[in-house]
Amino acid sequence: MIENLIIREYNSSDEKKWLQCRLISFHDSAYYDDVYTKKPVFNNSSLELVAELNGKIIGILDLEKDSEDGSICYCKSGVGAMIWTIAVLPDCRRYGIASKLVLKAKEWSKVNDVNFIEAWTRDDKWVLDWYESLDFEKFHSYWHIYFKGDNAKSLFDSNDKDISPQSVFAHSNKNPKTLDQNKIDRFYKCSGYKLDITK
């Protein structure tokens, strides 16, 4: 299937296909509602790749080198680069396309004096297993929690009666299983992974 696969740099004319690839690729994952309407623009050195097959974008990767003040990567052991997006269309998985994108990211990182690649993901086991198969190591985790309706309102302290929050997305170090489940709409464990490329 991938004999004609081309991995190349993203260009602005790819944006619509890039957005479609990301949307469809995330649809069967825990990030199904993390929808972009515009492709992000990066302020620091970055690698933006697309995997193209017969004119169709079937995979994408965005990697950004950490800023001088270290405000992008959570890890502080050297210079890092963050994978903001990596995705492959469901029908095109199991052909090693995502792994090829990561290999390109490693090559770019070595040339650009990056010591490690960092990535964050939710608790899809198949995604976690994939990162670990590439020698990424988990270094931290926390929780994404969603509240809706009256439960969202109870978290929002405002004297403005014209504001009525209907949904709240929160980061938490507290396991949501210890909270009142009737107040939570849904939650995910978000884990940080790190690939040391100095070895």
Where are these regions (language model features)?
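A short, internal acetyl-CoA/4′-phosphopantetheine-binding micro-motif in the GNAT/acyltransferase core
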Residues: 86-93, 121-122
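A short beta-loop-alpha structural element at the N-terminal edge
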Residues: 3-18
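A conserved beta-turn-beta hairpin within the catalytic core of GNAT-like acetyltransferases
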Residues: 66-83, 93, 115
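Conserved acetyl-CoA-binding loop-helix of GNAT-fold acetyltransferases
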Residues: 94-107, 132-133
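Conserved GNAT acetyl-CoA-binding A-motif
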Residues: 109-121
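Conserved acetyl-CoA-binding loop of GNAT-fold acetyltransferases
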Residues: 132-142
